[in-house]
């Protein structure tokens, strides 16, 4: 773990010594060839810190995933009490994710508020079309705008990274409409670089698998309800109890399509484990259970979307 206080040349806040960061990054190192090097990554970190200092205050839309956790942690280190992390709690947030996000914020002593959002009450969200994520973020950012006004905070930011700009992310449109900033993307930080920096900072979330909201497991066109989300959450938690780490339970009505990381598939294909998976998903309320031979793929539900929709990306 990096001693950020020593590396930053001071009390861990407001430091800007690039030599300390470069030394720390070099000592931590990374074996991933897709991360171009400690110096380039450290330069992006400096750009991120400079941007945060420029803002002077920021409210971070915080989910507990590696991107928003790293952004919130960096904002806390740079701005101290002039930042506030806000965690939106709703039926689409797994209880496991809520607990982990809260624990991480508490471990840093980071200012945190947990608010309730009711996106399921919005028909445009519940009908679950290709713009579901837009409506979710529209609700979230509207609530954050109101809260920021009450707290006297001028800026709102979220954890979009540089890779996200190349994917279908309708939430980006909501961010643009609400003038929500994306400091990680502005600094050019990719997911792999964020993981490397989070690891160097000693953040336990550095290798946490991506955990989008539970609604992302529901096939497009199927109404999202609390019962459906609870069913998905029960199913996924049961599979974690069986020892699987990176997985999705895709909800296709009476059928559960299980995606498991390819390096874990062999263990899933034993007769004993297939019986256990089937029993767990049936206990969660599914009548049919199928194992996707392609393994886990982030955003696999988007495969059914028309090309012209995917081409919009964040537009």
Region roles according to the model:
Residues 24-200, 256, 275-286, 295, ...:
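ATP-dependent adenylation/nucleotidyltransferase module used to activate substrates
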Residues 133, 180, 214, 268, ...:
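Short clusters of hydrophobic/aromatic residues that line enzyme substrate/ligand-binding pockets
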Residues 185-239, 243-248, 253:
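Mid-to-C-terminal catalytic subdomains of enzymes
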Residues 230-315:
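Auxiliary Fe-S-binding modules of radical SAM enzymes
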């Amino acid at each position: 773990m990096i001693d950020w206080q020593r590396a930053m040349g001071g009390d861990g806040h407001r430091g800007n010594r690039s030599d300390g960061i470069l030394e720390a990054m070099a000592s931590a190192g990374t074996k991933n060839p897709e991360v171009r090097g400690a110096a380039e990554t450290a330069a992006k970190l400096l750009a991120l810190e400079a941007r945060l200092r420029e803002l002077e205050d920021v409210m971070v839309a915080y989910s507990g995933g590696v991107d928003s956790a790293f952004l919130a942690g960096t904002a806390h280190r740079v701005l101290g009490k002039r930042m506030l992390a806000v965690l939106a709690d709703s039926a689409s947030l797994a209880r496991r994710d809520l607990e982990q996000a809260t624990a991480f914020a508490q471990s840093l002593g980071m200012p945190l508020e947990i608010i309730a959002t009711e996106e399921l009450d919005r028909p445009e969200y519940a009908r679950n079309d290709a713009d579901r994520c837009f409506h979710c973020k529209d609700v979230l950012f509207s609530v954050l705008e109101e809260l920021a006004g009450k707290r006297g905070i001028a800026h709102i930011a979220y954890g979009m990274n540089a890779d996200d700009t190349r994917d279908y992310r309708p939430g980006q449109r909501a961010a643009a409409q609400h003038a929500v900033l994306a400091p990680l993307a502005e600094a050019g930080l990719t997911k792999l670089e964020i993981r490397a920096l989070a690891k160097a900072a000693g953040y336990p979330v550095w290798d946490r698998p991506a955990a989008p909201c539970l609604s992302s497991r529901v096939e497009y066109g199927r109404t999202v309800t609390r019962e459906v989300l609870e069913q998905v959450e029960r199913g996924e938690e049961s599979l974690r109890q069986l020892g699987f780490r990176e997985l999705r339970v895709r909800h296709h009505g009476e059928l559960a399509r299980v995606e498991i990381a390819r390096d874990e598939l062999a263990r899933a294909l034993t007769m004993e484990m297939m019986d256990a998976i089937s029993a767990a998903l049936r206990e969660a309320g599914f009548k049919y259970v199928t194992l996707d031979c392609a393994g886990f793929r982030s955003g696999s539900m988007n495969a059914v979307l028309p090309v012209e929709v995917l081409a919009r990306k964040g537009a």
